[in-house]
Amino acid sequence: MSKGAKNHHLKSNVNEFLNNKRNIEALTNVIDSFKNALEKQIPLTTVILSCETIFVELLRSHDMTIHIKSLQGKENSPENNYKQFLQERYIETFNLIIECLGSDKTSDAHQALTTCMKFIAIEGTNPLESHDNHQTEFPIVHLNKVISKLLLSHRIMKNVIVKLSEYTMFDDFCYFVWKLLLKNLIPTTKNDLNNEFIQNYLELLNVLIPASPNNNQKYAEQDDDDEKRFLCKVVKFDQQLLRKNVNKIWNFIVQWPHNDVTQRQLLVLLLEKVLVHLEKPALLTDYLMDTLDVGGQVSLLALQGIFILIHKYNMSYPNIYEKLYAMFEPEIFHMKFKPRLFHLADIFLSSTYLPETLVAAFAKRLARLSLVAPPQDIIIILFFIGNLIIRHPGLKRLICDAANGGHEISNDPFLMDECDPNKSFALQSSLWEIQLLKSHMLPYISQTAKNITSQPLPNREWDLGEYLEVKENDVSIH
């Protein structure tokens, strides 16, 4: 049967059932078509929408709703037995749609999520069982199936998880997803706490936590009972509850076994979403200092976190400059995080009250690196060193010494391998490397080197941002 014929047959079965809701054969044919599509891994959107059409109608018309009378329980009648049959088909179909969340085709996975959420919203206001003392209940069992599929999949589900952001405007959705995330903090088995689970869990948190504390107040000016704030159930979810959830979850996830990917993901989440909600940011000290030693992008993100703690929370880190100093190695020129490293170093070294021995060590280390740097990075280094000298005029003597011959390269007292910048003998050295760059084959490099060594230097610093192409608030290093 051709694709067109199959679609026509499917549509015909949907219409036949909607015209006669006792037509079990037509309903069974639709569900069988769904199973067949899943088994043969053919496009699923059409069959998902067909099932959505059927069960949305059954939910809204209450054709599946069984009324439970107080003290009498569920009546055993042919009508209720048929409704029970329809409910079973509904649950069967819902489970099939859940499987589609893992589809390789993003459009199918997105449609599966949209349909699941539509079922949840409608079922919440049109429950499968009604009682005399009717109260709207959130279908948390179905939501749990969605969240569990996203978390426990043996693949990265980011392309589906990001679509959940469309529902974070609803207080009840956020309230119950947080409940489920807290429930899943401790997986059933150790095997479940794998890299895929951790990445998916962190991605869910990234969707749920607003970038700033006030971003989840979209409807703050509306009445608390405004139905636009709720998917199906009026339930309070406020800033205080968000803060409580974030703090509880952070204390768990920071202790999970992380590889480089999840460690980087965790740090980005911390910097962009979590930190502003933490009740005791000082407790991050050990974690960030330990992470600084990992290397690469992870260390740089940890450095960003320490920078925030220093400037926003008045915390001190005695050996932070040693950590920063150690990051400047030849490998940085081949890594994506290079602009961010220079940007942060520029901020950390912005104070004019820093010891000259410390600043001189950074200037000298960068000068040495300029000899092996690509041309575009040599320019950044030269302007960076120039700015350090403008901030600390006492360093001009390093240029003067170099201009007067300085030290023979073989007799340079500077210790490049010394971990402590204050013990590197940078002040006893000279910036002879910049003198060498004045003879560089590329005119714009040689001219820049001449500008740096010219006396006097300009009063205003060079704007590194033009060369780094990095925004001050950009900490998303992926």
Model feature map: region roles:
Residues 314-478:
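Eukaryotic scaffolding regions of large macromolecular assemblies
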